[in-house]
Protein backbone atom coordinates (compact mmCIF):
# COMPACT_ATOMS: atom_id res chain seq x y z
CA UNK A 1 0.00 0.00 0.00
CA UNK A 2 1.23 3.49 -0.75
CA UNK A 3 0.20 6.91 0.59
CA UNK A 4 -2.32 7.57 -2.20
CA UNK A 5 -4.00 4.18 -1.70
CA UNK A 6 -4.32 4.93 2.02
CA UNK A 7 -6.10 8.21 1.30
CA UNK A 8 -3.17 10.57 1.83
CA UNK A 9 -2.72 13.24 -0.84
CA UNK A 10 0.94 14.23 -0.67
CA UNK A 11 0.55 17.01 -3.22
CA UNK A 12 -2.32 18.57 -1.25
CA UNK A 13 -0.13 18.38 1.86
CA UNK A 14 2.79 20.10 0.13
CA UNK A 15 0.48 22.79 -1.22
CA UNK A 16 -0.99 23.29 2.27
CA UNK A 17 2.48 23.79 3.79
CA UNK A 18 3.46 26.27 1.07
CA UNK A 19 0.29 28.29 1.74
CA UNK A 20 1.04 28.34 5.48
CA UNK A 21 4.66 29.36 4.89
CA UNK A 22 3.41 32.68 3.54
CA UNK A 23 2.13 33.52 7.04
CA UNK A 24 4.62 31.50 9.11
CA UNK A 25 7.88 31.33 7.14
CA UNK A 26 9.74 29.37 9.83
CA UNK A 27 7.66 26.21 9.32
CA UNK A 28 8.16 23.41 6.84
CA UNK A 29 11.19 21.53 8.14
CA UNK A 30 11.34 18.45 10.29
CA UNK A 31 12.33 20.35 13.41
CA UNK A 32 11.36 23.74 14.77
CA UNK A 33 14.18 26.09 15.71
CA UNK A 34 13.92 29.01 18.06
CA UNK A 35 16.67 31.48 18.83
CA UNK A 36 16.54 32.64 22.44
CA UNK A 37 16.40 36.45 22.42
CA UNK A 38 19.30 38.39 23.92
CA UNK A 39 18.92 39.49 27.49
CA UNK A 40 18.05 36.12 28.99
CA UNK A 41 20.60 34.95 31.55
CA UNK A 42 20.85 31.17 31.92
CA UNK A 43 17.63 30.58 29.97
CA UNK A 44 15.51 27.51 30.57
CA UNK A 45 13.00 26.80 27.82
CA UNK A 46 9.60 25.58 28.96
CA UNK A 47 7.32 23.82 26.47
CA UNK A 48 3.80 22.57 26.88
CA UNK A 49 1.43 20.42 24.88
CA UNK A 50 -2.32 20.33 25.29
CA UNK A 51 -5.38 19.65 23.21
CA UNK A 52 -8.87 20.98 22.73
CA UNK A 53 -10.56 17.72 23.71
CA UNK A 54 -14.31 17.53 23.27
CA UNK A 55 -14.52 21.14 22.06
CA UNK A 56 -14.08 19.70 18.55
CA UNK A 57 -17.59 18.27 18.96
CA UNK A 58 -18.90 21.83 19.35
CA UNK A 59 -17.06 22.83 16.16
CA UNK A 60 -18.66 19.95 14.28
CA UNK A 61 -22.17 20.81 15.46
CA UNK A 62 -21.69 24.54 14.82
CA UNK A 63 -19.83 23.87 11.55
CA UNK A 64 -17.36 26.55 12.62
CA UNK A 65 -13.66 25.79 12.98
CA UNK A 66 -12.38 29.37 13.00
CA UNK A 67 -11.74 29.75 16.74
CA UNK A 68 -10.59 26.31 17.84
CA UNK A 69 -6.98 27.07 16.83
CA UNK A 70 -6.99 30.15 19.05
CA UNK A 71 -8.30 27.99 21.90
CA UNK A 72 -5.56 25.41 21.32
CA UNK A 73 -2.79 28.00 21.53
CA UNK A 74 -4.41 29.49 24.65
CA UNK A 75 -4.47 26.10 26.42
CA UNK A 76 -0.76 25.54 25.77
CA UNK A 77 0.29 29.11 26.55
CA UNK A 78 -1.66 29.10 29.82
CA UNK A 79 0.07 25.88 30.92
CA UNK A 80 3.49 27.46 30.28
CA UNK A 81 2.53 30.62 32.18
CA UNK A 82 1.53 28.53 35.23
CA UNK A 83 5.17 27.37 35.35
CA UNK A 84 6.27 30.99 35.69
CA UNK A 85 7.68 31.00 32.16
CA UNK A 86 7.13 33.31 29.22
CA UNK A 87 5.67 31.56 26.15
CA UNK A 88 7.97 32.09 23.16
CA UNK A 89 7.05 29.59 20.47
CA UNK A 90 4.40 27.07 19.47
CA UNK A 91 4.38 23.72 17.68
CA UNK A 92 1.09 22.26 16.45
CA UNK A 93 -0.24 18.81 15.60
CA UNK A 94 -3.40 18.49 13.54
CA UNK A 95 -4.70 15.08 12.51
CA UNK A 96 -7.53 15.02 10.01
CA UNK A 97 -9.32 12.71 7.64
CA UNK A 98 -8.60 15.08 4.74
CA UNK A 99 -6.82 18.40 4.34
CA UNK A 100 -9.65 20.78 3.46
CA UNK A 101 -11.17 24.17 4.30
CA UNK A 102 -11.88 23.08 7.89
CA UNK A 103 -8.19 22.40 8.43
CA UNK A 104 -7.34 25.74 6.82
CA UNK A 105 -9.72 27.45 9.28
CA UNK A 106 -8.04 25.64 12.19
CA UNK A 107 -4.60 26.73 10.99
CA UNK A 108 -5.71 30.35 10.53
CA UNK A 109 -6.95 30.18 14.13
CA UNK A 110 -3.63 28.76 15.32
CA UNK A 111 -1.78 31.59 13.58
CA UNK A 112 -4.18 34.13 15.14
CA UNK A 113 -3.71 32.51 18.56
CA UNK A 114 0.06 32.75 18.16
CA UNK A 115 -0.25 36.41 17.23
CA UNK A 116 -2.48 37.14 20.24
CA UNK A 117 -0.12 35.27 22.59
CA UNK A 118 3.00 36.88 21.15
CA UNK A 119 4.56 33.54 20.19
CA UNK A 120 5.99 32.22 16.93
CA UNK A 121 4.67 29.13 15.18
CA UNK A 122 7.95 27.33 14.52
CA UNK A 123 6.66 24.00 13.19
CA UNK A 124 4.33 21.10 13.63
CA UNK A 125 2.49 18.40 11.74
CA UNK A 126 -0.69 18.26 9.72
CA UNK A 127 -1.44 14.59 9.15
CA UNK A 128 -4.07 12.95 6.96
CA UNK A 129 -5.58 9.79 8.43
CA UNK A 130 -8.39 8.45 6.27
CA UNK A 131 -9.72 6.30 9.13
CA UNK A 132 -10.22 9.25 11.43
CA UNK A 133 -13.81 10.32 12.08
PLM region descriptions:
Residues 1-28:
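N-terminal amphipathic/basic leader segments beginning at the initiator methionine
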